Regions:
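Predominantly flavin-linked oxidoreductase catalytic cores and closely associated redox partners
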Residues: 1-128
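General beta-strand structural signal in soluble alpha/beta enzymes
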Residues: 26, 164-165
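Generic structural "secondary-structure junction" signal
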Residues: 36, 63, 134-135, 148, ...
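Short amphipathic beta-strand and strand-loop transition segments with alternating hydrophobic
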Residues: 77, 91-92, 142-149
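Flexible, glycine/charged-enriched surface loops at secondary-structure junctions
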Residues: 131-142
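FAD-binding beta-loop-beta segment adjacent to the flavin cofactor pocket
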Residues: 144-164
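Conserved small/polar residues in nucleotide/adenosyl-binding loops
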Residues: 168-169
């Protein structure tokens, strides 16, 4: 923290902590700064394709019992996104009249005005989705960046003295 753009120590500089151990397991998530440094330092991405990223938005809903179909999984791609933007949706029917409703937008879109949140809201206006959620109640929500590059984008999964437990570049 506190490192300036040119690499010098700024007024808020704090030395990072030392991670020491026989083995260090890194679980930093998407595009983590430590994982990025490890990939570069140990050339872990040398034999892999560049990673791709998306933004996933998910809501947990409680729906009317007569609309619930335990175990049903639905995936879609495309709409409401335009043909030059990748992404898709998911609906997972859970126990207790609950469903996850989510939408992923690939983060390589060209339109600077595109709103992944707005596209998710549009997705929920689809007649089938709107009917499913009508009379229901949103219980929780969240969003996170996800890696989408596939197996060919996974870097080498070990480095001297450690291994990732959840990492992407």
């Amino acid at each position: 923290m506190g490192i300036e753009r040119d690499g010098s120590h700024g007024p808020n500089y704090q030395r990072g902590m030392a991670l020491m151990g026989r083995y260090v397991l890194i679980g930093e998530g998407v595009r983590g700064s430590l994982a990025k440094e490890l990939i570069e330092r140990f050339s872990l991405g040398r034999d892999s394709e560049p990673q791709k990223f998306g933004l996933g938005i998910k809501e947990l809903w409680e729906i009317k019992p007569e609309k619930h179909k335990p175990g049903l999984i639905q995936h879609s791609f495309g709409w409401p996104l335009k043909s030059d933007t990748g992404g898709g949706s998911f609906i997972y029917h859970l126990p207790d009249n609950q469903v996850y409703v989510g939408f992923v937008t690939h983060l390589n879109y060209k339109n600077p005005y595109l709103s992944p949140f707005g596209e998710f809201q549009r997705f929920k206006t689809h007649p089938d989705v709107a009917e499913l959620l009508e009379g229901g109640k949103r219980l929780s929500y969240g969003a996170r960046a996800i890696s989408e590059g596939g197996f060919q984008s996974v870097p080498k999964l070990v480095f001297p003295g450690g291994a990732p437990v959840s990492y992407t570049h």
